[in-house]
Amino acid sequence: HIDVKILDPIFKELELFSLVKRVLNTDIEEDTSEKLSDIKVSYTDHSQDPASLLQKLEEADLYALYVVFKNGTLYNSWPTHLCFSTKLHEVSYINLPNDKNKALEIILQFQAIFENKNKILISADVKNDIIWLKRAGIKLKNDIFDIKIAHYVLHPDISHDLGRVALEYLNYKLSGSKKEDQQLTLQFDEEAGTEDNDFAEKTDVIFQLHEKLCDDLQQTGLLALYNDIEMPLVFVLADMEYEGVSIDCNELQSISSELKERIDIIEKEIYELAHQEFNISSPKQLGEVLFDKLKIDSNHKKTKSGQYSTSEQVLVKLEDEHPIINKILDYRGLKKLLTTYAEALPSFIDPGTGKIHTHFNQAEAATGRLSSLNPNLQNIPIRTEEGRKIRKAFVTGNDDYLFF
């Protein structure tokens, strides 16, 4: 006999979702008395009457916020939708106009709500909200509850995606999941589009998760860690992202030209040592040249995929076996500098600010270490002369500041 109440939370915590269906749904009979009935979610458009939504928010002590960006970035556009929920299964939204000035006018009508210290704001990822509101001249002063950060504090080793958290705490799968796996169904207004229903669904789920995650933080004794360490850090990281980083594109262009020249020279040297031209970036072709033609390591075996491994770890061990090895390692290093940094970094410059705004993720590593994405600014190389040149391309955004 399988005890569902014991296995179900274990499977979900370990993200063994296929086993939830295969084992729990097939090997046991469901207790239909505990099945959740369908729930109706109201979704009201206040685009033509923001005042009525404002009144609803003014009367509420807490509200969930879900913001939709379709075009542009946090730094050069405004949201297309602002979705709010002040009650369970009741969602209201504003569809903002495409005209940026008109959109900003509507956003500013909510300034008093966002700056009210007595209100609780529930968000799936409040750092983004802090940033776009700051652009609008609004300082978010609500008492914040961040779903992602709360779940990270409770479960640092697993995903904090909203859909993942909804499944774990509400036994609910967001739209896009297979119907047969769905434990709870939310019914929406048939006149609303599928996209609007998706926004309503997420907003309602955010509202529902607040109480459950709060209870968990209190019961586990982690509320102080959440309030005193993690949430203050959210605001610091938001300020860092908002400030951005400036780069000297002319310097990077010059570095790119130098790297290309060196890559071309090394490429020709590799061809001479191999006595043929081939795609150096192809592991298959490189493996055949090194181990079949040049016979560098007669004991080197092929992998299960049927080709030789040419990873850096493998090549470093063979450095003394043939001069072509060091050339290949140099080629790869320069190629990475060129494609990952010298050529790629300018593409991350936001057209609205002229700066790079990386994303700092504090809910990624269980150890608490921050990660940096789009682009990763934490692994700019410094070991080689070429890598240090890349770092020189990072400059201050103002002549009154210096890098130390």
Locate each region found by the language model:
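An acidic, glycine-/histidine-flanked metal-binding catalytic module
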Residues: 404
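Conserved "right-hand" nucleotidyltransferase catalytic core of DNA-directed polymerases
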Residues: 1-97, 121, 157, 185-195, ...
